[in-house]
């Protein structure tokens, strides 16, 4: 009986210590990304992680594995760190979490942060039925189509709080909205997806206007959304600027190739001239050598004839 009591005491002590350790675990940090969770291929982004209390060290986890370590600056006001992503690719897109350490204790992992790389492969087309201007209470359908082989599509409305809608289809998908209200008004784009974190270029924008009938006639409501010039505007600016840069780079590359080709032609021609001159000199030297040998033989024969 005493031995059994001792076993229960040991088990109880262990459970108590484990419970105490769990209670001492730090609260999970906050994680975010700038400028947006959708990042065009090649563009940079920054992941932020903020812990509570005196955080001494931060860890960034990518797809379940440890990605980076960082210590915050010695400032009590900015108790957070930044993890930069220099250039977004399909290899850096995915799910991120972060954690922090204070003393000997580590926090829980943060909520997941899903980063998506866009600008891969082709561009889908987006249309709306029955029309882009409708009356409140009607039903509308967005059609997103992509020629390449994909069965996953996302529809996204411009706005800070907008979340993408997911649909599946064979090269195309339908997004049904309705009955619509003025809150549905706004600018929409769609994407084709090759996996959850690799999206196509965005479609051209389609603007939906929702009218509300009133006593004084129909009133068209502008989109009641708090838009920001983060992803949407900067994407158009960046892709336009990038296309100009690509065009200039391509022209510069073509010019360099032309110059290189001309230089090669000049070098080949020069080598041809040098080779021809070398062959001409060699033939002249061989003819002179043969003539000299023939002259020597004639002199030897004449000398022998005189001796005899």
UniProtKB/Swiss-Prot annotation:
Gene Ontology CC: one annotated term: plasma membrane
Q: Name one Pfam family in it.
A: Ig_3
Q: Which SUPFAM superfamilies match?
A: Immunoglobulin
Give the GO terms filed under biological process for this record: immune response-regulating signaling pathway
Kindly provide the name given to this protein in its UniProt entry: Natural cytotoxicity triggering receptor 1
* UniProt note on tissues of expression: Selectively expressed by NK cells.
Q: Kindly list the places in or outside the cell where this protein is found, as annotated in its UniProt entry.
A: Cell membrane
Topology in the membrane? Single-pass type I membrane protein
Q: What domain of life does the native source organism fall in? A: Eukaryota
PROSITE patterns assigned to the protein according to its UniProt record, in alphabetical order:
IG_LIKE
Family designation: Belongs to the natural cytotoxicity receptor (NCR) family.
């Amino acid at each position: 009986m005493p031995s059994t009591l001792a076993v229960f005491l040991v088990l109880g002590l262990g459970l108590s210590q484990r419970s105490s350790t769990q209670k001492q675990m730090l609260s999970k940090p906050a994680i975010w990304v700038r400028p947006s969770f959708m990042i065009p291929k090649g563009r940079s982004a920054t992941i932020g992680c903020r812990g509570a209390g005196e955080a001494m060290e931060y860890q960034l986890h990518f797809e379940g594995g440890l990605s980076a370590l960082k210590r915050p600056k010695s400032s009590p006001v900015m108790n957070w760190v930044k993890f930069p992503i220099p250039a977004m690719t399909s290899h850096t897109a995915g799910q991120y979490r972060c954690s922090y350490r204070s003393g000997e204790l580590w926090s829980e992992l943060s909520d997941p942060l899903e980063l998506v790389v866009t600008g891969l492969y082709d561009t889908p087309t987006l249309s709306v039925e029955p029309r882009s201007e409708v009356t409140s209470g009607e039903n509308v359908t967005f059609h997103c189509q992509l020629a390449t082989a994909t069965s996953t599509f996302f529809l996204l409305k411009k706005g800070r709080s907008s979340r993408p809608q997911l649909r599946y289809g064979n090269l195309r998908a339908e997004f049904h909205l309705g009955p619509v209200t003025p809150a549905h008004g706004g600018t929409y784009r769609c994407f084709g997806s090759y996996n959850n974190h690799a999206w196509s270029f965005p479609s051209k924008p389609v603007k939906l206007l929702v009218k509300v009938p009133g006593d004084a006639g129909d009133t068209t409501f502008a989109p009641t959304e708090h838009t920001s010039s983060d992803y949407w505007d900067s994407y158009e600016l960046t892709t336009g600027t990038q296309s100009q840069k690509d065009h200039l780079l391509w022209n510069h590359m073509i010019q360099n190739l032309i110059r290189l080709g001309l230089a090669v032609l000049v070098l080949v021609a020069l080598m041809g001239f040098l080779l021809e001159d070398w062959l001409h000199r060699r033939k002249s030297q061989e003819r002179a050598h043969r003539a000299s040998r023939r002259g020597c033989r004639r002199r030897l024969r004449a000398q022998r004839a005189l001796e005899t």
